[in-house]
């Protein structure tokens, strides 16, 4: 996901089964920055990461480094076939609720990105039986109680 003036980008990763999202800021869309961000995001989840599907952009030129670092298989979508990475495209669309296309990402902090990602990872999804991506990915149940204000509060 790229910002308005193409100076800052967000690398987004989506886990297929749980719909769990990870995202990090990178300066531009250069291969070394993207590679560092992907490995930094996935290193804590190395045991759960077996395959990745990337688009054919130059930003993934260092894909072999990612594969070795994370001991994962890398696949590439066909050129101009964004539907082969539908979950990632959908995740980018959900993130656009917080960071719209006309927005300069240069003023956005990593904490703000993480806040938006956390909101999405704790949003119940119909496809997951109204569980959250966080619950499915980590195998934990988060209980929500109804407050007198009519909003759900986390216990």
Regions found by a protein language model. Give the residues of each.
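C-terminal domain-tail junction helix/linker
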Residues: 101-155
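Short small-residue beta-strand/loop micro-motif enriched in glycine and branched aliphatics
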Residues: 19-24, 76, 101
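RNase H-like two-metal-ion nuclease catalytic core shared by retroviral integrases
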Residues: 54-56, 61-64, 69, 76-99, ...
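Active-site beta-loop-alpha junctions of metal-dependent nucleic acid enzymes
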Residues: 2-6, 23-46
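Loop/turn elements at helix/coil->beta-strand transitions in domains of secreted/extracellular proteins
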Residues: 47-48, 72
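Short, solvent-exposed amphipathic alpha-helical segments in soluble enzyme
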Residues: 13-16, 39-41, 68-69
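An active-site-proximal beta-strand-loop segment
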Residues: 1-21
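Short catalytic-loop micro-motif centered on adjacent basic/acidic residues
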Residues: 23, 50-54
């Amino acid at each position: 996901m790229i910002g308005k003036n193409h100076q800052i980008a967000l690398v987004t990763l989506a886990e297929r089964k749980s719909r769990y999202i990870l995202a990090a800021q990178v300066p531009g869309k250069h291969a070394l920055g993207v590679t560092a961000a992907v490995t930094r995001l996935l290193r804590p989840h190395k045991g759960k990461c077996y395959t990745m599907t990337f688009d054919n952009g130059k930003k993934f030129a260092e894909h072999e480094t990612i594969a070795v670092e994370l001991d994962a298989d890398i696949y590439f979508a066909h050129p101009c076939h964004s539907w082969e990475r539908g979950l990632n495209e959908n995740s980018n669309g959900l993130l656009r609720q917080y960071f719209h296309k006309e927005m300069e990402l240069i003023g956005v902090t990593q904490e703000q990105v993480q806040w938006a990602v956390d909101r999405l990872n704790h949003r119940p999804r119909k496809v997951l039986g109204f569980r959250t991506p966080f619950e499915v990915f980590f195998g934990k149940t988060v209980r929500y109680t109804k407050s007198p204000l009519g909003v759900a509060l986390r216990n």
